[in-house]
């Protein structure tokens, strides 16, 4: 998709989107004749109504922003000091949580309680919703004119080609929710009773830049924009592109209300819904959206969590690698567990620093999610928690959490081209230049004495080898000298709790057998019935750390007992993240 079309999608999500930019910068303007939309009504966090709508494209009205003090712009006046003072959208409790002084990976229930982030089902909207912002102006009507109403238009771009219109009254102020983080371009339109209008110049009001941009989406809790955060590389994640939300029947009984539908369709302009719950009953099914069901397992057998959901994670990444699918919202039921897993993978891939990845996960505790969630805490005592997923990623080689996430995704069969596409779509400013630190051998490229199979079944990788006793797969490539992590991504149906995985397989380098340091049993490695529909349990497994000399080498993985489906065989440079 061309850049102008990409911007169209961003503009269409204007009310609940935005991007924090430096005060000295202006977003690129766009004049493509954006279509008109009907006015809509949405609630703010205090329960009153503000009506909006009409994605009005004014095209290139790039009036200078003006200086400080009280400024007169024709009949309009604005307090520049007020406009340039960032407004806060987070409540006191939310802000205190976001400024927590300790690593979020070690946060406790007591810590969360101190912020009133209890996750209790009794939490009200005032706990999770953002605060409203207010913009004031002065206006003197020309002689003989009577103001019938004001309209307030704002957007991310300096020409307001992405503008979202809020229908006001005759009051010379507007209060509303879901502004952008950072700079918001706006103008005011005075509508006179005789049908004529007068417009103010385009100005800027500011909102505090601290993410997340939590959202007021009708009666749906736990909603926020994935954008607005800085990355390891120095860029910033675009807002208005990916949203994490709850699903329909989020409390097992309530359907989303009309305000929620309005926000999602008329304001966010969502095009694609990804349901990562385990039931279509949580589908929102908005008119005009494409629904992708990527049902993820959670709870039950909580081992090899990342890999047992690998097929579904790849499905999510495939959706995000297609620009035509944006804006996207994804959810499970309450937007915390499976949604949290997905959020960790997306934030990690995009280069959000590790501490902020966990911070975003924990922000869900301001919503009624049944009970608290934090690393090490198992929801409903089901034996699963986000820490198991994160620890699998942290075990991968990489200089930081982004590289570790990238390599983990490669190891479960994601294509590097698609991962890079997602990074490019979602990043503004400096983009991460991730170089694969090793060789990933997909099933289609491996040499094998096993039975090669190509499958469109979601239970298996697209191409894999079925290897039983005496069968093998091998990868021959040129390597740089140094320590390497050898990783195999495979599935198996045997979930024996005492049989060691290392006793069932063999690893050779140039024909010489190697010691496998992995000490997991087949059960703890995640094999067997660990996903829905009795699917085979896929996992990635680090076999160990090995030293290679520079030049060509052949890595061979073979089966001594049992049967395994081999999806990838990967060799990564051994890199330990010094800091996340």
Write out the residue ranges for each language-model feature.
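Extracellular beta-rich ligand/substrate-recognition surface
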Residues: 115, 451-473, 494-499, 528-537
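Glycan-recognition and processing domains
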Residues: 20-30, 74-110, 432-480, 569-580
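Cys-dependent protein tyrosine phosphatase-like superfamily
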Residues: 69-328, 341-437
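Sec-dependent bacterial lipoprotein signal peptides
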Residues: 1-17
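Conserved structural position at the C-terminal beta-strand
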Residues: 190, 557-559
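Beta-strand-rich ligand-recognition modules
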Residues: 491-552, 559-574
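Ser/Thr/Gly/Pro-rich low-complexity, disordered linker/stalk segments of secreted
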Residues: 23-73, 449
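Extended extracellular/luminal ectodomain segments enriched in beta-structured repeat modules
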Residues: 480-489
């Amino acid at each position: 998709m061309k850049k102008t079309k990409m911007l169209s999608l961003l503009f269409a999500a204007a009310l609940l989107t935005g991007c924090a930019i430096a005060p000295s910068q202006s977003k690129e303007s766009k004049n493509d004749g954006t279509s008109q939309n009907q006015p809509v009504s949405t609630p703010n966090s205090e329960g009153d109504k503000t009506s909006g709508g009409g994605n009005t494209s004014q095209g290139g009205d790039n009036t200078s922003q003006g200086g400080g003090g009280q400024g007169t712009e024709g009949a309009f006046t604005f307090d520049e000091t007020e406009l340039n003072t960032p407004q806060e959208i987070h409540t006191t409790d939310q802000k205190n949580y976001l400024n927590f002084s300790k690593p979020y990976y070690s946060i406790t229930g007591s810590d969360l309680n101190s912020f009133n982030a209890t996750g209790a089902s009794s939490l009200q909207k005032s706990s999770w919703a953002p605060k409203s912002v207010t913009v004031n102006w002065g206006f003197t009507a020309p002689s003989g004119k009577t103001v019938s109403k004001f309209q307030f238009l704002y957007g991310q771009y300096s020409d307001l080609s992405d503008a979202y219109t809020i229908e006001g009254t005759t009051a010379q102020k507007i209060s509303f929710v879901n502004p952008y983080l950072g700079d918001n371009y706006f103008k005011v339109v005075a509508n006179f009773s005789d049908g004529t209008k007068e417009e103010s110049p385009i100005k800027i009001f500011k909102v505090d830049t601290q993410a997340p941009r939590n959202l007021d989406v009708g009666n749906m809790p736990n909603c926020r924009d994935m954008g607005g955060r800085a990355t390891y590389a120095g860029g910033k994640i675009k807002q208005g592109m990916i949203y994490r939300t709850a699903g329909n029947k989020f409390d097992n009984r309530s359907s989303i209300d009309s305000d929620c539908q309005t926000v999602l369709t008329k304001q966010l302009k969502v095009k694609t819904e990804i349901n990562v719950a385990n039931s279509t009953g949580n589908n929102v099914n908005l008119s005009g959206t494409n629904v992708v069901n990527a049902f993820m397992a959670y709870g039950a057998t909580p081992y090899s969590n990342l890999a047992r959901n690998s097929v579904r994670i790849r499905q999510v990444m495939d959706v995000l690698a297609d620009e035509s699918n944006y804006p996207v919202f994804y959810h499970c039921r309450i937007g915390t567990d499976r949604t949290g897993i997905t959020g960790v993978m997306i934030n990690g891939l995009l280069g959000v620093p590790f501490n902020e990845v966990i911070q975003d996960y924990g922000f869900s505790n301001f919503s009624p999610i049944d009970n608290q969630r934090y690393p090490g805490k198992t929801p409903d005592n089901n034996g699963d928690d986000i820490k198991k997923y994160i620890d699998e990623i942290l075990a991968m080689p990489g200089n930081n959490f982004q590289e570790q996430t990238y390599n983990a995704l490669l190891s479960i069969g994601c294509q590097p081209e698609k991962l890079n596409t997602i990074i490019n779509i979602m990043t503004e400013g400096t983009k991460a230049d991730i170089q694969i630190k090793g060789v990933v051998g997909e099933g289609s490229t491996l040499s094998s004495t096993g039975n090669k199979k190509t499958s469109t079944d979601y239970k298996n990788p697209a191409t894999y080898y079925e290897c039983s006793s005496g069968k093998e797969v091998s990868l021959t490539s040129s390597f740089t000298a140094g320590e390497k992590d050898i990783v195999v991504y495979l599935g198996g149906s045997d979930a024996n709790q005492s049989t060691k995985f290392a006793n069932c397989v063999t690893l050779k380098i140039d024909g010489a057998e190697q010691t496998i340091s992995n000490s997991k049993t087949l059960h703890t490695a995640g094999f067997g019935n660990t996903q829905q529909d009795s699917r085979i349990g896929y996992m990635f497994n680090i076999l160990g750390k090995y030293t290679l000399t520079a030049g060509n080498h052949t890595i061979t993985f073979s089966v001594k007992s049992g049967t395994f489906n081999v999806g990838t065989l990967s060799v990564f440079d051994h890199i330990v993240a010094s800091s996340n």
